[in-house]
Design a protein with these regions (language model features):
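Tubulin/FtsZ superfamily GTPase core signature
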Residues: 1-196
């Protein structure tokens, strides 16, 4: 979704990706801890050069999420970072995945409270699914990802546009844990992507 918009520079980090500019393919590891320990040096140096102000989209559903903290540690001092942390559905969280989710969930909040990062946006996949309504099974994940992307993009559009009329006040510096959502004007109903 973000590649459709020229204002975003998309950097992908995952296993099994074809290496190219802004794409980093990591070797498959058996645990989140091994991903954290085995981050290639070139990822950190490259990201320090490339990334100035970014939002990192992270989910804990795979072991590769263990790389998130190591990558963040390498770039956080030189970069204004916000994190969009996507929490898997509760049915998918058990064993090590649940522990990894709890670790990232708490560490990202602590980083935002201490101003090590600009902000953390918490997104619950179940809440996004509820907001999306019925979706064909084969397009389920694509629909959820598109909804998150489109919502985040429109917030960026509004934040970088001059309002004709506003009732909003400036965000206070200590408000660093957030979520996003949708408003249904017909029902006058907010559909938040996480319950804060």
């Amino acid at each position: 979704c973000f590649k459709r918009h020229s204002q975003y520079s998309v950097i992908k980090i995952d296993v099994g990706l074809e290496k190219s500019k802004n794409v980093f393919s990591l070797k498959r590891q058996s645990s989140p801890e091994l991903y954290e320990e085995n981050i290639p040096y070139d990822i950190g140096t490259s990201l320090q050069r490339e990334v100035k102000s970014e939002t990192l989209f992270i989910t804990s559903c795979g072991n590769i999420s263990g790389a998130a903290l190591a990558i963040l540690e390498k770039i956080k001092d030189n970069t204004k970072i916000s994190i969009m942390y996507i929490i898997p559905q509760k049915d998918d969280l058990f064993g090590d995945k649940k522990l990894q989710n709890n670790l990232l969930f708490n560490v990202f909040q602590e980083y935002s409270r201490s101003a090590a990062i600009e902000r953390v946006f918490l997104i619950d996949n179940q809440k996004v699914s509820d907001a999306a309504g019925p979706v064909p099974v084969l397009k389920y994940w694509a629909a959820l990802n598109e909804m998150i992307c489109a919502t985040y993009h429109m917030i960026n559009v509004f934040e970088h546009s001059s309002p004709v009329l506003t009732t909003m006040t400036s965000r206070i510096n200590t408000a660093r844990i957030s979520t996003i959502g949708l408003m249904d004007p017909k029902k006058n109903e907010e559909k938040m992507f996480f319950s804060l």
